[in-house]
Amino acid sequence: MAISDNGGGSVGLCYGSEFSISDHWDKLTRPSSIKVVGDGDLSRSAELIVEPLESGFALTLGNALRRVMMSSLRGFAVYGIEVEGVSHELTSLSGVREDVADLVLNLSMLRVKLLTSESRVLRLVAKGPGEITAAAIGDSEGCVVLNKDLHICTLGKDVDFSMKIYVNSGKGYVPASEYRAASRSGATSEVGPGFIATNALYSPVKKVAFRIESSRIGQFTDYDRLVISVETDGSISPDEAVAVSARVLQDQLQSFIGSEEVEGESRKKVDKEEGALPYDHNLLRKVDELELSVRSHNCLKNDNITYIGDLVQKTESDMLRTPNFGRKSLNEINEVLASMNLHLGMKVPNWPPESIENLSKQYSED
């Protein structure tokens, strides 16, 4: 390393190899493992475990993803109803235990999934006596009712009941006053004269929380593990909610990447990754780069294992037959390989590649 003066009075540090702007992100540890775990229906409630992350990144990413999931994902909701023989929400219904205000409140909690972005009109026709739930609506073409056990109303004997339920897609929370004003102005031409607007909560995510735990790579334990707990209404799965939120953030942050130099470095990296190797470039790294104990390193060296590509093709039985190599060393190697999404017993076609030494240097430098 040397110290240089650029002529303007400022002093900079010069290193042996040229610094690339892509080093800002390439030199950071990226998550190598994302697991979806939970009890019961993973399409509605699950935990996503992401590791390893650089220290502090779990808090940064967890906060950003939680905020986007709770505020910016689009979903589906009821925005209005029409009940046969009813002109406004203060009307009482003969033979129905609930009044119209109760119906509006109950139906505002109806959760559906539309297969298109167009609004739809669902129909509910029932005859008493008995409790009427969302199951009476049934699934229509292009729409699925998700909470069919939702209580809607209770009918008396021989009471005929008919209503329309208006659903559409949207984002966040829209108060009934907005849809009421839209219907009066004629902006919502599909509704009838007896339209009664409801408050619409579109967010498909019911609850998000995250916690931060310690993670490790080899002997180093100063990494983060991010555990995100997500509960949805069933119109989107928890892992999809996280993925979409990440895509929203990616799209918004893209505007900040205005530097041509940054764009150029990103493009070169993508081009290289797209055209390079038929297998994980980690296989080209030497086992000397792994954070292993001295005993494990010596065992690999004595067994003439130079590259990670050589190592992963060994089975656990092969490794345990190596002199002085025990179960503790095996667990250590399994853990390090798992952090790179690799494992023992892999089959690597066409290994080793030609000019492996040059390829190894190239990817080590990058």
Curated annotation (Swiss-Prot):
Keywords, in A-Z order? DNA-directed RNA polymerase, Nucleotidyltransferase, Transcription, Transferase
Top-rank taxon of the source lineage equals Bacteria
Gene Ontology BP term (one): DNA-templated transcription
Region of interest (Alpha C-terminal domain (alpha-CTD)), ranges = 274-366
> Alpha N-terminal domain (alpha-NTD): where is this region?
1-260
Q: Which reaction does it catalyse?
A: RNA(n) + a ribonucleoside 5'-triphosphate = RNA(n+1) + diphosphate
GO CC terms, sorted: cytoplasm; DNA-directed RNA polymerase complex
Subunit composition and interactions: Homodimer. The RNAP catalytic core consists of 2 alpha, 1 beta, 1 beta' and 1 omega subunit. When a sigma factor is associated with the core the holoenzyme is formed, which can initiate transcription.
Q: What is this protein called?
A: DNA-directed RNA polymerase subunit alpha
What's the source species' lineage? Bacteria, Pseudomonadati, Pseudomonadota, Alphaproteobacteria, Rickettsiales
